[in-house]
């Protein structure tokens, strides 16, 4: 169905210079998919088709981390001054305006790429849209420790935000 839409768009365009090549490409993709000839796509479309597939466990981890940070940032934004002070006192500098800074762009690129795709392409976790998402330092291990602690709290957050004590518990696990 998508290939038929693409064919119609190519035919309707005023500029037909590349139409023949584009139609050939659409037909190739369509025939490869319909015929089960997936091997043909990387042969013909070098650079577009590749062997990389995101690890589903890493996708799940990134979703859990983004979900956790959504709760942290949203709750903190609604805390009173006294509650914010309580978090900062309980955690130290990590408790002062806690924000998700992403993943290390040099060593955690798959995690960063998954996060960017979720936010920018799929429109998920829109609170992070427009952010760099490159922490410039290793972050996965810290986020995973926090997410592990958060999972026990998460199931009780139906219809309510995190409390200062819950946030302190999660943020403290960043250093554990």
Please report, for each region that a protein language model flagged, where it lies by residue.
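Extended alpha-helical scaffolding regions
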Residues: 28-124
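Charge-dense, extended regions
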Residues: 108-176
